[in-house]
């Protein structure tokens, strides 16, 4: 192992998985944006609200039945696909002796649905799903919790996310943060960081 980094933490959606939702729903893209940026959704991602209560509250906010909100997210999660380039990079990192983790904001039902998907889950040394941990990005306590759980210093950890605010939070606790805007460029940057 030639790298000084011991761990790499990756976001899921938009980083390790891509999605092109082809969803048959009454929920507009605008409403979807309103939902995922709401306090109710953030509490759902922290595991603080039961699914039926969350979907009912969100449905009331946009004038649709909660069952329609639930169905939309089941379909959307079903549209996630692993990014082959990033999966290959995970294998490379493991080969370099770097522990690989996933840290994602995700409600429990979506996480359990995702885990049913055929994927190389054994690549991960650990998975931190917000709803199961009771905290979410960009809350600094979530990053500190993960560092404690993986028993690695922030300076020895690389963090990759497609949301800039999450990268800034990782940098605030001392991690090397990479903002993914293009998977090829990010893969190259990661290889440079850990390469011999």
Curated annotation (Swiss-Prot):
Stored SUPFAM superfamilies: HAD-like (SSF56784)
Coiled-coil region(s): none
UniProt xrefs under InterPro entries: HAD-like_sf, HAD-SF_hydro_IA, HAD_sf, PGP-like_dom2
UniProtKB keywords: Hydrolase
Phosphoprotein found in the keyword field: no
GO molecular function, one term: phosphatase activity
Catalytic activity: (S,S)-drim-8-en-11-yl phosphate + H2O = (S,S)-drim-8-en-11-ol + phosphate
Enzyme's top EC category: hydrolase
Induction remark: Expression is regulated by the secondary metabolite regulator cclA.
Pathway noted in the entry: Secondary metabolite biosynthesis; terpenoid biosynthesis
Keyword Ubl conjugation: no
EC number(s) from the headed UniProt entry: 3.1.3.-
UniProt xrefs under CDD domains: HAD_sEH-N_like
Pfam families registered for this protein in UniProt: Hydrolase
Function: Sesquiterpene phosphatase; part of the gene cluster that mediates the biosynthesis of astellolides, drimane-type sesquiterpene esters that show antimicrobial, anti-inflammatory, and anti-tumor activities. The first step in astellolide biosynthesis is performed by the sesquiterpene cyclase astC that catalyzes the formation of drimanyl pyrophosphate from farnesyl pyrophosphate. Drimanyl pyrophosphate is then dephosphorylated by the sesquiterpene phosphatase astI to produce drimanyl monophosphate which is further dephosphorylated to drim-8-ene-11-ol by atsK.
Family note: Belongs to the HAD-like hydrolase superfamily.
Name the record gives this protein: Sesquiterpene phosphatase astK
Organism the protein comes from: Aspergillus oryzae (strain ATCC 42149 / RIB 40)
């Amino acid at each position: 192992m030639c790298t000084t980094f011991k761990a790499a933490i990756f976001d899921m959606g938009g980083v390790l998985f891509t999605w092109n939702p082809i969803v048959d729903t009454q929920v507009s893209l605008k409403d979807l944006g309103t939902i995922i940026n709401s306090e109710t959704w953030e509490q759902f991602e922290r595991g603080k609200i039961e699914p039926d209560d969350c979907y009912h509250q969100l449905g009331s906010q946009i004038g649709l039945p909660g069952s329609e909100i639930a169905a939309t997210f089941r379909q959307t999660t079903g549209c996630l696909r692993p990014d082959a380039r990033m999966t290959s990079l995970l294998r490379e990192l493991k080969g370099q002796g770097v522990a690989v983790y996933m840290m994602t904001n995700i409600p429990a039902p979506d996480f359990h649905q995702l885990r049913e998907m055929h994927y190389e889950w054994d690549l991960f040394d650990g998975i931190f799903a917000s709803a199961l941990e009771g905290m979410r990005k960009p809350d600094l306590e979530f990053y500190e919790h993960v560092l404690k759980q993986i028993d690695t210093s922030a300076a020895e950890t690389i963090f990759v996310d497609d949301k800039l605010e999450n990268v800034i939070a990782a940098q605030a606790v001392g991690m090397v943060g990479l903002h993914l805007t293009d998977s090829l460029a990010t893969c190259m940057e990661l290889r440079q960081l850990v390469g011999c």
